[in-house]
Design a protein with these regions (language model features):
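Conserved functional micro-motifs across diverse proteins
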Residues: 1-135
Length: 135
């Protein structure tokens, strides 16, 4: 079955990176273990981060408000919108184990010369992707 991102037009982005390198730090509870970054798209107006979440045990998933990106020497930039995933307190639900949810978080643009950045769901308790390489 086709997914909306399969036909997404990335022409407006200056840089598109599939499956970038990063270090992942899941939450203390195992719900985030199936989470990975599948694509990053950068433009002068926004940073688009696409994820894939593979459901293993739990039957629902969401993204917390306040999830942010941060490049070295910059302030935190919280996401502006989410595509194809529920934002807390709402939940995206699954029919079965092994089901994959593809979603995107859209953030403000990061500085053009940024070499790497991090994404964090929350400062202390949430999942984190660090050292996401873009150059």
């Amino acid at each position: 079955m086709a997914h909306p991102f399969d036909n997404f037009d990335y022409a407006r982005y200056d840089i598109v990176i599939d499956y970038p390198q990063y270090r992942f730090y899941p939450t203390p509870y195992s719900i985030s273990d199936g989470l990975r970054i599948s694509r990053i798209a950068l433009s002068s107006t926004e940073t688009r981060v696409e994820f894939e979440f593979t459901n293993t045990v739990f039957d629902r998933f969401n993204v917390k408000r306040g999830t942010y990106i941060k490049a070295s020497g910059t302030n935190k930039l919280e996401f502006k919108r989410a595509e194809n995933v529920a934002v807390a307190p709402y939940m995206s639900t699954f029919e079965k184990s092994g089901e994959i949810l593809k979603f995107a978080l859209i953030f403000p643009a990061i500085p053009p010369k940024t070499k790497s950045f991090l994404i964090a769901e929350q400062d202390k308790k949430g999942w984190k992707f660090k050292g996401i390489k873009i150059r």
